[in-house]
Amino acid sequence: MDLLFDEFRAAHVPVEEMATHYIPEAARQIGAAWDSDRIGFAQVTIAISRLQELLHALQTLVTADSVGCANGATVLLIVPPGEQHTLGALIVAMELRRRGVSVRIVFAPGLSDLSRLMATTRFDAALITVGSMDRVEICAKLVKTLSSLTKGRMRVAIGGAIVSQRAEALARTGADLVTNDLSLVISEFSLV
């Protein structure tokens, strides 16, 4: 891992670019190799695990949550139940933190989990990531639950790998915004 960091530093590649460009591109190439049967399950698992390890190492250099931006926005980032693709959510969380937004990630939350969380923590927005067409209905339920728990006060955005293929279906979930453009979410929701 250190050798890889050294190579990126020698090429003057910023941490942000590693996280927002190179890691996602590597994940896309791994996915394409899997789809075309050039690599097997074990190779995909190991490769994605290494990308997550690299991302984790990069996150130690981005400390918005630990700095404690008292007036900064707080976002709830949700990976829906059954969703297997989590790397994108981790990249989004890192980028939000880099921009000064505090992020709480929850994986596969149930209704009671969200109820407890919303009762004890104030969030400025919720972002739901979806990578599978099978999760559109679950996203709609999450949007409805969040709206109910916050009496419609919290804005919700949906993003992820299927946005380009299922934008219309995702728009019908009731989310305020459906996009993969994080800058647009930050701007529209006034997060920074």
From Swiss-Prot:
Pfam families: B12-binding. It comes from the Bacteria. Residues 72-192 form the B12-binding domain. GO terms for molecular function: cobalamin binding; metal ion binding. This is Uncharacterized 20.5 kDa protein in bchF-crtJ intergenic region.
